[in-house]
């Protein structure tokens, strides 16, 4: 069996069906003896360019190990499902199980957002303390 990275884009009006689609696709792979090494739902994102006058899509990424037969069936499912507006299948040399760059970037963004919010509250408290110490120094003079 070979390893593949599969990314598919779902029409934004069909986002609620993504869970069912992922279940169907994982079931198809596992019934043929394959394995799902990584599954990431990247959510609804802006497209770089419009596809059929659609500017956003729901992104899903799978790293799988499967047979050629299962992959062909999966690609047929993508082709005949109107909700899937694009798909990409890349053959990999080995299983990839760590978080993707997209997921890492999202985590970094949320961490930076949290850090930005914390110092604002901390700076306000420190600013009050430093002003008090400055005032007490001035009072001693």
UniProtKB/Swiss-Prot annotation:
Q: Which GO terms describe its molecular function?
A: small ribosomal subunit rRNA binding; structural constituent of ribosome
Q: State whether keyword rRNA-binding applies.
A: yes
Q: What is this protein called?
A: Small ribosomal subunit protein bS6
RNA-binding found in the keyword field: yes
Q: Which family does it belong to?
A: Belongs to the bacterial ribosomal protein bS6 family.
What is the stated purpose of this protein?
A: Binds together with bS18 to 16S ribosomal RNA.
The encoding gene: rpsF
Record field: compositional bias (Acidic residues):
125-141
One Pfam family it belongs to: Ribosomal_S6
What GO cellular component entries does it have? cytosolic small ribosomal subunit
**Biased amino acid composition, Basic and acidic residues:** 103-124
Q: Which InterPro entries match?
A: Ribosomal_bS6, Ribosomal_bS6_CS, Ribosomal_bS6_sf, Ribosomal_S6_plastid/chlpt, Transl_elong_EF1B/ribsomal_bS6
Q: GO biological process annotations for this chain's record?
A: translation
- Region Disordered, residue ranges: 96-141
| Keywords on record | Ribonucleoprotein, Ribosomal protein, RNA-binding, rRNA-binding
Which superkingdom heads the taxonomic lineage of this protein's source?
Bacteria
